[in-house]
Structures are given as structure tokens and as C-alpha cells.
Amino acid sequence: MLGLGHDVVDVGAFAEQLEMPGTRMTRLFSARECRQASLRASIKHDGEALHLAAKWAAKESVVKAWCEALVGRGITERPYTVDDTPWSRIEIVDDATGCPRVVMAAEVHVELCRSLAVTESAEPVWHVSISHDGGIASAVAVLDMRE
């Protein structure tokens, strides 16, 4: 294991941010993530904000695991700052069975490999778990390496 990240989101506060006029919150998600959150909300008869909050917790967890992996390798340079992290290019999408998966856009994946000095024979692997209960959404992400 190279890195571990965890995040907790207050769903009510997150929903309020989503509803604010001019909010940037919706730009943090890809169209595919928004479609999946909407579909899941309609199936589960709950709010779309709940599912987006869980995806947001997972995205934060992914970035935290990435940063921990850098620290573990003695790397102090960060590929992105808080202001320029390409959040919508780090997707949390459900597979055919409904399990969450991390899908990075090609340029983000390249940056991940570059920042961690990944060799051609290795491949970064993400594991993510999402949960929500009441007004709290939570996620854990683990970054591993397949040799």
C-alpha cells in the first residue's frame, strides 16, 4: 500500500453549497458522475446531494492517498494545488454492480505516474469504499501498485 486517504462530508452543508447561486460545486463532477448520482437518487428515493457528497468524499480521499504516497516516497513536490486540482477529471463512478471505482482522465493518470516515478512495469491501482448514514457521507481510498 502506497497511500491511504479518508474523508467525511456533512451532506446537509454540501447540499446547501450545491444549491447556492453561482456555486462551483457542480463543476467538481463530470457529467457521468452527475448522471449516476441522479439515477441512484431516483432508484433509492433519496437526494442527489447525498450521492454527490459521497463521491466528493471519495475524491478527497483519493487526493489524500496520493499525497500520502508522495510523502512516503520522500517527494515534497505536489502535482496540483487546492486551486488547480482537476476534480472533474478524477471520477468516482459505479461499475455494473454498483461498486465505486476511481477513473482518472489520461492526463491525470500520467501525472500520477510521473509524480510517483512509476516504472513502465508497474501500474497504480485504486481501491475505494463509500458509505453514508443519516447526514454523513464517508469514503476511504487506498493507492496500491501492481508490479
From Swiss-Prot:
Its cofactor is Mg(2+). It holds the Pfam family ACPS. One of its GO terms (molecular function) is magnesium ion binding. InterPro entries: 4-PPantetheinyl_Trfase_dom, 4-PPantetheinyl_Trfase_dom_sf, ACPS, Ppantetheine-prot_Trfase_dom. Keywords: Cytoplasm, Fatty acid biosynthesis, Fatty acid metabolism, Lipid biosynthesis, Lipid metabolism, Magnesium, Metal-binding, Transferase. Its EC number is 2.7.8.7. One of its GO terms (cellular component) is cytoplasm. It comes from the Bacteria. Its main location: cytoplasm. It is found in: Cytoplasm. SUPFAM superfamilies: 4'-phosphopantetheinyl transferase (SSF56214). Mg(2+) binds at D7, E60. It is an enzyme of class 2 (transferase). It catalyses: apo-[ACP] + CoA = holo-[ACP] + adenosine 3',5'-bisphosphate + H(+). The keyword Oxidoreductase does not apply. Belongs to the P-Pant transferase superfamily. AcpS family. Transfers the 4'-phosphopantetheine moiety from coenzyme A to a Ser of acyl-carrier-protein. This is Holo-[acyl-carrier-protein] synthase. It comes from Bifidobacterium animalis subsp. lactis (strain AD011). The gene is acpS.
